[in-house]
Amino acid sequence: MFKKTLEIPADRVRSVKTTTRDDKQGKVTVDVSAAETRALKATGEEELLSENELDLLDLAQRKVPTTEGLRELEALNKIAPESSRDDPRADQLEMAAAPSPKSKLRLVLSIVGPGFLTGMAGNDASAIGAYSIDGASNGYGHLWLMLLSTPLYQAVQFACAKIGRVTQRGMAEILRTHYGRRVAVLASLVLIVANVALVAADLVAIGSGFELITGLSYFWFIVPVAAALWYLTVYRNFETIKKIFIALSLAFVAYVITAIFSGADWGTVLVRTFVPQIDFKFASISSAVAILGATISPYTIFWQVQGEKEQKRPGPMRRKIHMAALDIAAGVISGNLVAYFIIVCTAATIFVHHGQISTAADAARALQPLLGPIAKYLFAIGLIGAGVIAIPILLASTSYAVAGTFGWPAGLSKKPWQNEGFYLILTVALVISMALALAHVDPIQLLFWANVLNGVLTPVLVIYVLLVGNNRKIMSDQRLGILTNIGLVVAFLVIAAAALLLFYGLLTGQGS
């Protein structure tokens, strides 16, 4: 009646004692950590994971922050949640049980996780559009914002990772449990509105990519792309396809190289990077809100909490949090560097010639100094790859938030008939986004204003991160440090101030 089903890899078995006359039961000795020991005393089915290190390709693939990557992590994480309340001896036992990387490359891969790849994946198709429009419209004027947003982005993402690691819960579930359902509903609504707009923008971006390649209107690609992504996300393990599109999305790294050969005025670039230049015109303010929203967005807040919750890291809590900080720093710096050079590149090639970005082809012109006539094809490939990777993540984060708000079972590792509510939310969000994408809204304007909306909504979630991260009942002795708190407060003030200036411009008719 009270038996527990175990799956024990052979490498975890240390000795086997068969039945004797005096002892009717045999004895199997296995290596387990303190966390696993506690889990074995709980009800339900558990699984002891193999100590053997994954091969390099498998290890790398499990770090990819796609819906499929999260599905794999969910399947692995059957051991009970770890907690900051573990005693030091338990942490030491966990450290002893954890396998050591065999090479420097494996060590790097063991650190790289949701933080790095969320930072890089944050440069989705709509974000690329926002950065390109900013560079083409404002030149080098907002480069200082990219520098300022880097430590702020680090603070926000680190706080989210720490919350996920310590609580082993999703953000919406934490808010519902400790602050009530109304607070959780508000946070989920913020995320839903932002994500639906971003998914619509990314669908349009993918369609625009196909338009550059085929010459057919982007409009005809939206429904097939949405249907294919829904099917792959819900029903299929699209591991091979995922690898291809991740590689395609790296095409935007070409902006870094192009910026170097674009003839940019590097003296002006350096001045504009370190000396803030604030322009209170509506076009400049709205563009500033867009790039802030593209950098620190609602979905990355929810996704970082969920990703760190699912990420397996060896060692005691202090080491896990330190590894998460390094992971996030790598992602934030890499992602913001790409965004920085996109602005430099478009400023040096489009702004200086008084050009504008009205279509995807206009945005592709920024790559022509390096790539010539093939620029539009590489840009199209990048748009398609970035969009295909981002949309499932946006949909999944929406489903996790709503499911956590109402206490529904959630997880991509379960089949649709086992998780009807979770997959219904995902489907409804995609249908609404598809309808918005089909509404004949100007594609470039949709890309831009989706990120403006992100910038307006993000401060609400930053406040929630502050509240949760400093709540003793939730975080125990692992509350956020003073530097992280300062970063969160400054992030809130900067983004909120930009949003207020945007609203002032709209109310005074500057946006018309």
PLM segments and residue spans:
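Extracellular/periplasmic helix-exit of transmembrane alpha-helices
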Residues: 152-166, 306, 310-314, 333-362
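Hydrophobic transmembrane alpha-helices that form the core helical bundles
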Residues: 162, 166-167, 184-215, 222-226, ...
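Juxtamembrane transmembrane-helix boundary signature
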Residues: 118, 145-179, 186-197
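Loop-to-transmembrane helix boundary motifs in multi-pass membrane proteins
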Residues: 181-182, 219-223, 330, 334, ...
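Flexible loop linkers connecting adjacent transmembrane helices
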Residues: 91-96, 130-135, 158-183, 208-210, ...
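Hydrophobic alpha-helical segments and their helix-loop junctions in multi-pass secondary transporters
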Residues: 250-276, 288, 292-308, 464-473, ...
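Membrane-interface loop-to-helix entry segments
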Residues: 224-225, 233-263, 453-454, 458, ...
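Transmembrane alpha-helical segments of multi-pass small-molecule transport proteins
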Residues: 188-189, 213-235, 251-256, 420-432, ...
